[in-house]
Swiss-Prot record:
Protein name: Type III pantothenate kinase
Localization, UniProt: Cytoplasm
Names of the cofactor(s): NH4(+); K(+)
Gene that specifies this protein: coaX
Species of origin: Wolinella succinogenes (strain ATCC 29543 / DSM 1740 / CCUG 13145 / JCM 31913 / LMG 7466 / NCTC 11488 / FDC 602W) (Vibrio succinogenes)
Keywords, alphabetical: ATP-binding, Coenzyme A biosynthesis, Cytoplasm, Kinase, Metal-binding, Nucleotide-binding, Potassium, Transferase
Length: 210
């Protein structure tokens, strides 16, 4: 069985505990796979997957989450189902933060990812076109422009997450998940969280719950 989480840039795959990613244009059929299931926030990339795996099944219509949130993306739903309790942070081009309690989604928010902060600052002034310093010290005020930009972007993200997690366990996934997790003592980095939610949905389908 092959699972695919189709994001804004990459197609993320999961098979027998292994996780990897591919760009749509580089996607090729691998070994013969009888079962392929996917979720997608990118229709063109989903069409590309279906060109390679025409029998792939979209799990979105079968995915259900106990929430009052209107319009919650299927990727966020899968991540929430993958943890059941705690705060899940999916740190990609955008960062989503969702709070779960006893399998109930209490709400969440979206903010720019680290790379997006850099792009926004560059659009303000050419003088702010600096590569962010991911090693910047957050406990001391910066003494140069590059560190000042880096401090402002990274500390804003970290503090937003801190204010939301309270005493809950934090789960990080996504491209910048491992980097952000190091700022939190109670953090777990797991790039299979979304796939765990997809697997749970498949279990519910087999049990006739969906």
């Amino acid at each position: 069985m092959l699972l695919c989480d189709i994001g804004n840039t990459y197609l993320h795959f999961y098979q027998e505990g292994k996780v990897w990613k591919e760009l749509p244009r580089r996607l090729k059929a691998g070994m013969e796979v009888q079962e392929v299931y996917y979720i997608s926030v990118n229709p063109p990339s989903a069409r590309r997957l279906l060109e390679v795996y025409p029998h792939a099944i979209d799990l979105a219509p079968h995915m259900v989450l106990d929430t009052a949130y209107k319009g919650l993306g299927v990727d966020r739903m899968a991540a929430c189902k993958g943890i059941e309790d705690g705060v899940v942070v999916d740190a990609g081009s955008a960062i989503t933060v969702d709070v779960m309690q006893n399998q109930v989604h209490l709400g969440g928010f979206i903010m720019p990812g680290i790379a997006s902060f850099s792009s926004m600052l560059k659009s303000i002034s050419p003088a702010l076109e600096k590569e962010l310093n991911l090693s910047v010290e957050l406990s001391a005020l910066p003494q140069n422009t590059r560190d000042a930009l880096s401090y402002g972007a990274i500390k804003a993200i970290v503090m937003m997450i801190q204010n939301s997690c309270k005493n809950k366990r934090l789960f990080f996934t996504g491209g910048d998940g491992k980097y952000l997790a190091r700022f939190f003592e109670n953090a777990i980095h797991d790039n299979s969280i979304v796939f765990k939610g997809m697997l749970k949905t498949l279990e519910e389908m087999k049990e006739g719950k969906r």
